[in-house]
């Protein structure tokens, strides 16, 4: 299996020490978000690769050489300020972290996500064009692939409409973004791609590809993986991964996040984290049913 660490919360940013404790002990327990009494026990001997997804990869860097599994990084890096990404650290530090990671695991294993693209009076198309070009310039030689997506109508987006103040992205916006982003990427030796987007931007120079394709999964593990996206009803063809995260436990508090939408619950869960526990949040009870997961 390939571990997703994590699409539900930013384990790398806030819980790296816990993850390394689990790695050293050889297993991790994951509570089923839809049936909380069920717990999957995952042994790292059954793990073929690890995909780290984070807005702040800095805390995990010191541990990377200890991890004897193939690693992929998806690092989200946008031009948004604290009004949208409330607790995300200084972007200059993140960029330096990306460079360090690229040197450690290789440029082909590091993906940057400019994600999601949203338009309002502050974050105009012109703003994004300039921010994306600056990003490409700073990461030239350290990143080959940048993934973009456009904002989706998640629960948290609806709850934060007073903050986001979204404007509709029309075809003219898509064309300008596509042409300008593609030009910036090419000038800095990168490829810009989309995944699970209904709009076809290939005519503007984007590549339609998957965040974790069957080809890439085979390259890093030597195994064939079936398509197993949880994003039903989309054009996503990413391979199946196993997420070990926990919803509503990320203190980044990004206004557009799909996985963290209850601020009170986020604070409670964060306080219920124990770095020595086998679970990310909380502890195992007598009523829990633990089953080993192999794939």
Which role does the model predict for each range below?
Residues 8-10, 55, 76-80, 115-117, ...:
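Active-site beta-loop-alpha junctions enriched in small/polar residues
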Residues 93-160, 180-196:
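Conserved C-terminal portion of the radical SAM core fold
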Residues 172-237:
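A C-terminal junction/extension of Radical SAM enzymes
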Residues 55-56, 159-163:
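Auxiliary alpha/beta "docking" domains used to position bulky ligands
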């Amino acid at each position: 299996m390939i571990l997703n660490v994590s699409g539900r919360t930013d384990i790398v940013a806030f819980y790296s020490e816990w993850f390394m404790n689990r790695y050293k002990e050889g297993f991790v327990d994951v509570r089923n978000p839809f049936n909380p009494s069920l717990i999957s026990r995952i042994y790292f001997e059954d793990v073929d690769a690890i995909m780290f997804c984070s807005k702040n990869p800095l805390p995990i860097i010191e541990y990377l050489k200890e991890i004897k599994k193939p690693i992929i990084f998806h690092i989200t890096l946008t031009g948004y300020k604290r009004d949208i990404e409330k607790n995300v650290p200084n972007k200059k530090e993140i960029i330096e972290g990306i460079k360090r990671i690229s040197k450690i695991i290789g440029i082909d294993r590091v993906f940057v996500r400019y994600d999601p693209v949203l338009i309002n009076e502050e974050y105009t198309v012109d703003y994004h064009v300039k921010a994306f070009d600056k990003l490409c310039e700073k990461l030239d030689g350290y990143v080959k692939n940048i993934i973009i997506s456009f904002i989706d109508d998640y629960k948290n987006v609806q709850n934060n409409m007073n903050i986001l103040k979204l404007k509709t992205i029309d075809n003219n916006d898509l064309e300008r973004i596509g042409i300008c982003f593609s030009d910036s990427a090419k000038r800095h030796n990168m490829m810009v791609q989309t995944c699970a987007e209904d709009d076809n931007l290939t005519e503007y120079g984007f590549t339609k590809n998957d965040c974790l394709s069957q080809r890439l999964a085979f390259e890093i593990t030597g195994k064939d993986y079936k398509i197993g996206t949880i994003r039903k009803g989309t054009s996503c063809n990413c391979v199946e991964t196993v997420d070990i995260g926990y919803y509503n436990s990320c203190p980044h508090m990004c206004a557009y996040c799909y996985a963290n939408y209850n601020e009170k619950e986020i604070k409670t869960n964060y306080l219920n984290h124990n770095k020595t526990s086998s679970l990310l949040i909380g502890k195992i009870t007598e009523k829990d049913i633990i089953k080993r997961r192999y794939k």
